[in-house]
């Protein structure tokens, strides 16, 4: 098999970043390379094509890695996607399509089809590409999960893949984490370890070298590179709303526009904020504080994995009252997908997609009543890549939802959704990544809020910034981890 696995000593060790940079570095050499993550757990996903050309879901990181590899993203690059709807329950997406739900206790005996699908997806990629760069999940040293593992060492052993182990030194304890991981692995798994990498290092590498030499002596593992801390680098968010990432490189001194994003407990597809955070002159915060939400020029209510649960939370926290006051004062609000549904008048869930109780027994639920919209949940999920226009600007987005919004006939339209005064709503994710649309919408927001902000015509577009970030990662791989790059190139089939 023409592949390798990048595993981590923990979650957020930097696996996704390194795989992104490695894919671009390999692609620069004219090699057809594909990313792969057997199982991802995230409520932030992207709509791509399945093998039959139909729409399907994968994690945002694998979508970005496919862009880095300069190939079309497919559902095989993330065949199993778990989308948590509670602490003990996840919606399962299998090769891009809804598969069902799994409770925490059901996972151990219900993962057989997931393993089968993930292996079939890897084999399809291995046949279609010269190299497959795999990303692990969590840590391979979770020995309590080893028996059924198909994401880390289980994947590596099944396909005979060498493993590069990544540790995050910025958190502290990286040397111990690498040594502990090595020590906990079975001997057959240890033999697959090709070496380790240090990620997010600040300072003089010579200070670190004695520790690396000792670690190599005790484990026999070579150091494949030391990646420095990289400013201005981000990844499309996997699980949480992150404040101000990516932020503008230089804070300009001109007029400002403030955006407050509601930190919903069950937020999904939070990447809608990334392009807003990168816009010059925009100050973006993610918050639950009513005073900050009341004061902002724009409030964004993002997508939700549990619209009904988050609607109840909005009321319980008093944020619903803040939104009502803003609407009454013609102060801008934007709702996206679940946030849009919550801003509407009613939500019906006869199939029990979100509401508890037997299907068909759920009563009509009142929304916040700020938009002339009525939402009906369907058991079947809607996936798509819609296009439209607003104020003469072509707009492309993507949609992932069970709720179908019915807009009143006499309502003012906003993309696929509605506008009432200064309240806007749409089911479409990803629209803010379109530079012309984002700038036009924020200009409208500034006019409504009385802000003097205007877009900077000289600023780089969001897509250009993302490409520059990918190239920064690839440059770091080439400069600081040549041994990792050599390992990858040696696996080209």
Task: Indicate residue ranges for each PLM-predicted region.
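Flexible phosphate-sensing "switch/lid" loops adjacent to ATP/NTP-binding sites
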Residues: 1-325, 332, 349, 379-380, ...
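Non-catalytic terminal/interface segments that mediate subunit docking, oligomerization
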Residues: 298, 355-356
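Catalytic nucleophile serine of serine hydrolases
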Residues: 337
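Short glycine-enriched nucleophile-adjacent loop
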Residues: 344-345
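Conserved P-loop NTPase catalytic core
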Residues: 353-354, 360-384
């Amino acid at each position: 098999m023409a592949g390798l696995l990048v595993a981590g000593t923990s979650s957020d060790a930097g696996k996704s970043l390194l795989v992104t940079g490695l894919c671009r570095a390999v692609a620069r050499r004219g090699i057809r390379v594909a990313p792969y993550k057997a199982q991802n757990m995230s409520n932030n996903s992207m709509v791509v094509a399945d093998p039959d050309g139909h729409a399907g879901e994968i994690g945002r990181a694998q979508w970005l890695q496919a862009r880095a590899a300069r190939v079309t993203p497919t559902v095989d690059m993330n065949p199993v996607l778990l989308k948590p709807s509670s602490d003990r329950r996840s919606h399962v997406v299998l090769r891009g399509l809804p598969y069902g739900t799994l409770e925490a206790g059901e996972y151990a005996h219900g993962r057989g089809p997931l393993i089968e699908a993930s292996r079939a997806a890897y084999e399809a990629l291995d046949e279609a590409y010269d190299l497959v760069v795999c990303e692990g999940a969590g840590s391979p040293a979770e020995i309590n999960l080893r028996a059924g593992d198909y994401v880390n060492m289980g994947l590596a052993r099944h396909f005979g893949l060498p493993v590069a182990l990544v540790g995050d030194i910025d958190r502290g304890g990286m040397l111990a984490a690498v040594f502990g991981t090595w020590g906990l692995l079975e001997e057959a798994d240890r033999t697959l370890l090709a070496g380790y990498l240090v990620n997010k290092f600040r300072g003089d590498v010579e200070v670190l070298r004695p520790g690396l030499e000792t670690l190599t002596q005790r484990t026999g593992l070579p150091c494949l590179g030391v990646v420095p801390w990289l400013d201005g680098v981000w990844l499309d968010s996997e699980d949480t709303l992150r404040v101000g990432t990516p932020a503008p490189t230089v804070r300009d001194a001109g007029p400002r526009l403030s955006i407050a994003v509601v930190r919903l407990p069950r937020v999904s597809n939070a990447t809608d904020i990334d392009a807003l955070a990168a816009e010059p002159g925009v100050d973006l915060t993610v918050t639950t504080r009513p005073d900050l939400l009341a004061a902002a020029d724009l409030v964004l209510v993002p997508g939700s994995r549990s619209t009904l649960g988050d609607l109840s939370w909005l009321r319980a926290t008093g944020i619903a009252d803040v939104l009502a006051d803003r609407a009454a004062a013609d102060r801008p609000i934007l709702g996206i997908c679940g946030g849009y549904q919550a801003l509407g008048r009613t939500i019906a869930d006869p199939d029990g997609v979100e509401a508890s109780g037997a299907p068909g027994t759920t009563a009509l639920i009142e929304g916040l009543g700020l938009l002339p919209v009525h939402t009906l949940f369907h058991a079947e999920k809607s996936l798509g890549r819609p296009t439209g226009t607003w104020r003469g600007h072509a707009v492309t987005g993507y949609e992932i939802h069970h709720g179908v919004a019915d807009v009143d006939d006499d309502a003012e339209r906003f993309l696929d959704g509605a506008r009432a005064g200064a309240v806007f709503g749409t089911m479409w994710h990803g629209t803010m990544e379109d530079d012309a649309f984002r700038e036009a919408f924020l200009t409208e927001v500034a006019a409504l809020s009385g802000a003097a902000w205007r877009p900077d015509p000289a600023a780089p577009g969001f897509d250009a910034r993302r490409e520059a970030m990918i190239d920064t990662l690839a440059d770091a791989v080439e400069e600081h981890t040549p041994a990792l790059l050599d390992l990858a190139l040696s696996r080209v089939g």
